[in-house]
Amino acid sequence: MQPYIKSLEQLVYPQYCNRCEISLSEGEQLYCSQCRVADIKPTKLGNWVRGLQTHHNLDYAISFYCFGEVIQAYIHHLKYSSWNSFLTRLINNAVKAEELPMEASDAVMLPIPLHRVRQRDRAFDQAAVIARELAQQWNLTMDESLLKRKKYTKTQTTLSIQERQENMYMAFQTAENTPKAVILVDDVLTTGSTADACAVRLRENGSTWVGLVTLATPKLKKKYR
């Protein structure tokens, strides 16, 4: 009943964006999503692979934005096609601020895969949505078949770094003869252990350069510039 009353209230007393004055959609407050995108600035910190707890098998790592409530909301809403235009703007702004290294000029974009159980629970794959948009803007190919998640992994917060690496390594399986250069893609980056485990598998099957691109991270610090 409450959602119905709220929708009826918005219909009778519509709310407007404080900046552009268009009608706010359900879930928006004070400012519309488009105006919020304009306020989110890319980190411009470049390659900060040395800042990851586990990075020995990664050559490159960038995170476009610092993770906060606004970015979290965008990631949550990626499953709705109406939000894709906002993702396009977010990535377009970030791509302008970051240049890929020469080693990645012909790289293949690869979203870090979810286990089928987790993907079923989420009903969509954020990493794949982001990777598809990045591939289009960077004019690169995307191939989701290069890496499969064969093992479901529970939370790893109680595990040591070495235990996390071993646990994640066993979770993935790659195709034979992977491309020389691969860019892994995910929504949010924390320790880097998942990406590093993926990189190990890719290197075992032919990849010589593995990078990582994420939409956001809560761990960016300027000392990793």
What would you call each of these model-derived segments?
Residues 1-186, 190-225:
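Glycine-rich phosphate/pyrophosphate-handling loop used in enzymes and phosphotransfer proteins
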